[in-house]
Swiss-Prot record:
Binding site for Mg(2+) 2: 273, 275
Co-factor: note: Binds 2 magnesium or manganese ions per subunit.
Functional note: Catalyzes the synthesis of N-acetyl-L-aspartyl-L-glutamate (NAAG) and N-acetyl-L-aspartyl-L-glutamyl-L-glutamate.
Organism from which the protein derives: Mus musculus (Mouse)
Binding site for Mn(2+) 1: 260, 273
Region (Disordered): 345-370
Annotated ranges, domain ATP-grasp: 115-300
Protein name: N-acetylaspartylglutamate synthase A
Any one Gene Ontology BP term: protein modification process
Phylogenetic classification of the source organism: Eukaryota, Metazoa, Chordata, Craniata, Vertebrata
Binding site for ATP: 154, 189-199, 215
Binding residues for Mg(2+) 1: 260, 273
Cofactor names: Mg(2+); Mn(2+)
Length: 380
């Protein structure tokens, strides 16, 4: 029986750069290796229990065989346990190997849930408070007093650096109360001053660090996200930083992810966030990588009678030039040098006004013309 691979995503994000790149790479590899391939939208699937047995319908047609591996790309800020996660759990119970698994995605869709999972494992994290009720933000102002000021305030379901505030003092925090959405809880987090406006994005695939990027704010704001106008540059990471990112990925059970590390004065790191549906346009550009292809190779390695994912992706991760580069430490001096490089042309930006153009340019370079993207999703 022919092995099958699916790429499963939301129709609304199908034309985003990561989905296009993974689609291209999976289709190519499945064609070359005589493996069945489908690109599937979540809204095409119906899950069934008939006669006490699990079943699956695709576009209203019952399936008699199921995919061996499913690469999942869902918009984590909007993921709901009674909709998207229900479908993912069903596929997993049918014996499909999901990349990432539903529990791993759940571990990351709420920022406080991530910290709950990491707690007790010796992972360095900023002290963090949160609450249960959606209307309890104002009640937490006094509770969060031990964190000191300024204090970081984040939506537990925020993404791309949105819904993040830095409250200068208690009065400022009270003012923020009138600005926040009250449909999700917020968290209050100790401010890491030395990492203001900068962090390290580390991408992990199959339990291995494939690259790291220094992200820097260009307007003085605390968030360094490229989506908000920050810029990124390839940045070597210490062994301690790599092991921390891998540890976080393993604890959360993720096959591929982005780990954001804050930089301490002594060169050590503390974990800021983990992303199960990591974007990688700016990362590909800064690090000269094709993360979509690496994810596809890892997914193919999980098919029956294949090598383990770890063995399969080791040989091609670094180019000869990258292999000869020193594995330098991200220190205060290293950060300063990287920022200087950023401001002198070695930049990658994912700010909103340029995102569409950057995405289209990159997709053309990688071999998937944007005009044909929608049609590509219809070719099963």
């Amino acid at each position: 029986m022919c092995a099958q691979v699916w790429l499963l995503t939301d129709r609304l994000i199908r034309e985003d750069y990561p989905q296009v790149q993974i689609l291209r790479a999976l289709r190519q590899r499945c064609s070359e290796q005589d493996v069945g391939f489908r690109a599937v939208f979540l809204d095409q699937i119906a899950v069934t229990v008939v006669g006490g047995h699990l079943g699956l319908q695709l576009s209203q047609k019952p399936l008699t065989t199921f995919p061996d591996v499913v690469v999942v790309r869902v918009s984590t800020p909007s993921v709901q346990s009674d909709s998207e996660i229900t479908i993912l759990r069903h596929l997993e119970k049918l014996g499909c190997r999901l990349v990432n698994r539903p529990q791993s995605i759940l571990n990351c869709i709420n920022k406080f849930w991530t910290f709950q999972e990491l707690a007790g494992h010796g992972v360095p994290m900023p002290d963090t408070f949160s609450y249960g009720g959606h209307e309890d933000f104002s009640k937490m102002i006094d509770e969060a007093e031990p964190l000191g000021y300024p204090v970081v305030v984040k939506s537990t379901r925020g993404h791309r650096g949105k819904a993040v505030f830095l409250a200068r003092d208690k009065h400022h925090l009270s003012d923020i109360c009138h600005l926040v959405r009250h449909d999700v809880p917020y968290l209050f987090q100790k401010y890491v001053k030395e990492s203001h406006g900068k962090d390290i994005r580390v991408v992990v695939v199959g339990g291995q660090v494939i690259g790291s990027m220094l992200r820097c704010s260009t307007d003085g704001r605390m968030q360094s996200n490229c989506f908000l106008g920050g810029v990124g540059v390839k940045c070597p990471l210490t062994e301690q930083g790599k092991q921390l990112a891998i540890q976080v990925s393993n604890i959360l059970g993720m096959d591929f992810c982005g780990i954001d590390l804050l930089i301490m004065d002594d060169g050590s790191f503390t974990v800021c966030e983990a992303n199960a549906n990591v974007g990688f346009l700016a990362f590909d550009q800064a690090c000269n990588l094709d993360v979509g292809a690496i994810i596809a190779d890892y997914a193919m390695s999980l098919l029956p009678n294949r090598q383990t994912g770890k063995m399969a992706i080791l040989p091609g991760l670094a180019s000869p030039r990258e292999k000869n580069e020193p594995n330098g430490c991200v220190s205060a001096q290293g950060v300063a040098e990287s920022v200087y490089a950023i401001t002198n042309g070695s930049t990658s930006s994912e700010s909103e006004p340029e995102l569409g153009e950057a995405r289209d340019s990159s997709v053309k370079t990688m071999g998937a013309p944007p005009a044909h993207v929608a049609q590509a999703w219809l070719q099963h």
